[in-house]
């Protein structure tokens, strides 16, 4: 089904956070994450003025840290870039094609079935791992149920937890 394929794309997209999933990309992200004055949850809240947050991640883009939140509003998708020092919206770009559009479509499909918001899922994951910092939260479907794949940085270790959204 289209929804099943969308869910697979969404979960596969989670692995794209580290570009080529190389150690260098992970090391850069771990190092740069310390420079952020806000957490992922604050970025999610800041993006809400641009629609329903459907995924969020810190990433390294051209050697610089970036906080990106995908939102859905009135059937359209947007990438909201958040200033990781102030928590203010820097830029809003429509997502209309390509891999980003496919990812946003699958994430939106998963969130449409969710009873829990993305921020609530992140808060719950953090509460179960007190010292960890959230790197990303990307929803998808697992066995027909909406689940958020949440990447946590605990010390120098990255780990992924699956947080049910229903």
Question: What do the predicted segments below correspond to?
Answer:
Residues 1-166:
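Long, terminal "pre-/pro-" and other extracytoplasmic accessory regions
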């Amino acid at each position: 089904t289209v929804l099943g394929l969308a869910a697979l794309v969404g979960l596969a997209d989670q692995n794209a956070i580290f570009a080529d999933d190389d150690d260098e990309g992970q090391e850069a992200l771990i190092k740069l994450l310390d420079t952020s004055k806000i957490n992922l949850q604050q970025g999610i809240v800041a993006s809400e003025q641009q629609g329903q947050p459907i995924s969020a991640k810190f990433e390294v883009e051209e050697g610089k840290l970036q906080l990106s939140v995908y939102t859905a509003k009135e059937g359209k998708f947007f990438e909201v870039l958040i200033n990781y020092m102030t928590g203010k919206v820097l830029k809003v770009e429509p997502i209309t094609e390509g891999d980003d559009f496919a990812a946003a479509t699958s994430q939106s499909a998963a969130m449409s079935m969710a009873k829990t918001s993305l921020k609530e899922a992140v808060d719950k994951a953090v509460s179960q791992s007190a010292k960890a910092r959230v790197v990303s939260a990307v929803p998808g479907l697992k066995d027909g149920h909406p689940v958020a794949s949440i990447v946590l940085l605990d010390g120098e270790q990255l780990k992924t937890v699956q947080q049910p959204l229903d």
